[in-house]
Design a protein with these regions (language model features):
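Short, acidic/turn-prone active-site loops that include or flank metal/cofactor-
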Residues: 27, 95-102, 260-261
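Short glycine-rich phosphate-binding loop at a beta-alpha junction
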Residues: 65-75, 153-155, 209-210, 396-408
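Active-site core segments that coordinate phosphate-bearing ligands/cofactors
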Residues: 1-3, 17, 103, 110-172, ...
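Short linear loop/turn motifs
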Residues: 207-216, 327-331
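Short beta-strand-loop/turn "lid" adjacent to the catalytic site in phosphate-handling enzymes
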Residues: 59-97, 125-131, 163-186, 211, ...
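N-terminal glycine/serine-rich phosphate-binding loop of ATP-dependent small-molecule kinases
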Residues: 1-92, 104, 120, 225-233
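Conserved beta-strand and immediately adjacent loop positions that scaffold enzyme active sites
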Residues: 11, 79-81, 181, 253, ...
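Short, conserved phosphate/pyrophosphate- and ester-handling motifs at nucleotide-, phospho-/glycolipid
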Residues: 42, 99, 237
Length: 408
């Protein structure tokens, strides 16, 4: 049973022993925008949707829970929350990876000269995208003004929250791939970095235990599905895509087109600190039989709004009725009519990392039609990916040998 917990919805897939999908289920998630630039999810809705898709997939497959050999979990990364370990209740909505509320905090850290140290320790560029400043905000804005006892609080990314619920509160853990996206994880030691915990004022006891990506994370509580099913893999969604494409050596690269687009290049056993504004991250880790851990690294270019731009064309300004319409409209004109779109609806990610950038259309004249605007948005998505591929090649440390593509 594979659980794919995405930004816009949760999916469950059941595979047979030959790797064929025998059933699947999907449930959309509500997106909450309390202020411009903010995005939240209801953690209880995420958990309930997870339960729903698991049960639907099992029912559709007409199997028993005892037939399921193992559960694997992949999640959208960086999104994080706090919850009460006694009641199991979230203390606030989860702050989603696209949320920009902590941009000012990030700018302050840059001005104070922390950029290089954080880059060396974590492989990441200071940005509101990552979890650290989100957790600081939650502690300062939710916990500090209240009478909440910090000894009763747990924090984590979505994988930790779902794992904790799957196991009935028995396991508070994460894997290396998700931990490496928090800006609190030391990429070299593969542990929570005490200096960064102090910098972000995050008590160490709140954090989940870091475990290898492919290993043992406990079992589901018996009354959840009707059996104790072992949980044997947890990955960040983009690392899961890299694994699924078989990108197991340097030069193999994948690009996923979803809410955002994420281009990830396997770098083998080496941490590559790119000077081209790309981030270093864990690909995945695995338990060896001799109690050692096999570690793989990757280089990533994160582009925040690609599919989200198409969603905005539909829901925000009503230029299209559905996503499929974009191709038809784009093909009705021979070029973009001189119109260019900046896809910075949530700032710009790699290779620019500009939290203050905003989306814009340029080159509009009286002859521009709806088709030109739609085409310029599609072209902007392609231009972003080209920039990141070029940045990888320009690093001089890695050449893109093969690029694999998926979407969701």
């Amino acid at each position: 049973l594979a659980l794919d917990l995405g930004t816009t919805g949760n999916r469950a897939f059941l595979f047979d022993n030959s790797g064929n999908v025998i059933s699947q289920a999907y449930q959309e998630l509500t997106q909450y925008y309390p202020q411009p630039g903010w995005l939240e999810h209801n953690p209880l809705e995420i958990w309930q949707a997870t339960c729903t898709v698991m049960q639907k997939a099992i029912q559709q497959a007409k199997i028993k829970a005892t037939d399921i050999q193992a559960i694997g979990l992949t999640v959208h990364r960086e999104t994080c929350l706090l919850w009460d370990k006694t009641t199991g209740q979230p203390l606030h909505n989860a702050i989603v990876w696209q949320d920009r509320r902590t941009a000012f905090h990030c700018q302050k850290l840059q001005e104070q000269g922390y950029a290089e140290e954080i880059f060396v320790r974590t492989g990441l560029i200071i940005d509101a995208y990552f979890s650290a400043t989100k957790l600081t905000w939650l502690l300062e804005q939710v916990v500090k003004p209240s009478s909440i006892n910090l000894d009763n609080v747990l924090d984590g990314t979505i994988d930790s929250w779902i794992l904790w619920n799957l196991t009935g509160g028995k396991v508070h853990a994460t894997d290396d791939s998700n931990a490496s996206r928090t800006m609190l994880y030391n990429l070299t030691t593969r542990e929570w970095d005490t200096k960064l915990l102090d910098l972000f004022n995050i008590p160490a006891h709140l954090l989940p235990k870091i475990q290898p990506t492919l290993g043992y994370f406990g079992t589901t509580k018996p009354d959840l599905l009707g059996a104790e099913i072992p949980i044997t893999a947890i990955l960040g969604d983009q690392q899961a895509s890299l694994f699924g494409h078989g990108c197991d050596r340097p030069g193999l690269v994948k690009c996923t087109y979803g809410t955002g687009s994420f281009l990830v290049a396997r770098t083998g056993n080496n941490i590559i600190h790119s000077q081209q504004q790309l981030i270093a991250t864990i690909a995945w880790t695995q338990n060896n039989s001799n109690d050692t851990t096999k570690v793989g690294y990757a280089l990533e270019g994160s582009m925040f709004t690609t599919g989200a731009c198409i969603q905005w064309l539909r829901d925000g300004i009503g230029l299209i009725d559905n996503a499929a319409q974009t191709e038809m409209l784009a093909q009705q004109v021979s070029d973009n009519g001189g119109v260019y779109f900046v896809p910075a609806l949530s700032g710009l990610g790699a290779p620019h990392w500009d939290m203050n950038a905003r989306g814009a259309f340029f080159g509009i004249t009286g002859g521009v039609k709806r088709q030109h605007l739609v085409r310029s948005v599609l072209e902007a998505i392609a231009f972003q990916v080209k920039e990141v591929v070029q940045a990888i090649n320009d690093s001089g440390l890695l050449q893109v040998e093969r690029l694999k593509v998926d979407g969701g």
